[in-house]
Amino acid sequence: MGVFLIIIGQCKPYTRCYIFVPLKIKIMENYKTPEQTKIGHVHLKVSNLDKALSFYRDLLGLEVTQYFGEDAVFLSAGGYHHHIALNTWYSKDAPKASPNTVGLYHVAFLYPTRRDLALIIKRLKDNDYPIIGGTDHGVSEAIYLTDPDGNGVELYWDRPKEQWPRAENGNLMMYNGFLDIEMLLKEI
């Protein structure tokens, strides 16, 4: 077992928290994450909860599943307890993070069909919300935007696995190609 530095402090919304900081990381040999493992949710620090809700709830259509006072909220698609959590515990009225620092690059939302992706793109366009990029990755088609705090957001759909581009040796061959958004909108 590695050596840990234990930091005891005040944490919101909890009264006390223990943070275990590894002083030396011991690598377990031959460990593989179970195949059924998924990323369950992302918890974002935001500067203004109302602006963040306007984006995630009102524009993208996520449903609020629970409020935690005036400082935090859980949102979901499809009845899950939460896919996105938003809080202002340490970030209320904070400036946007510089894009040239470490941290979150983007959160990606997987839509079930190409038509569903087209529908959200139309919604963004109808609301004059800026799309900052679009890419055909071979395995998927994606658009990119930012939330009110500058967090990157990817909206995409996956092609069926049997259509994914592969090399002769079977390796996946993703790429960054042109995405014709107007052609995609013809799905509607």
Residue ranges and their predicted role:
Residues 7, 13-33, 38-47, 95-188:
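Vicinal oxygen chelate
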Residues 28-31, 92-97:
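Short beta-strand/turn micro-motifs at beta-sheet edges
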Residues 88-91, 158:
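Acetyl-CoA-dependent GNAT
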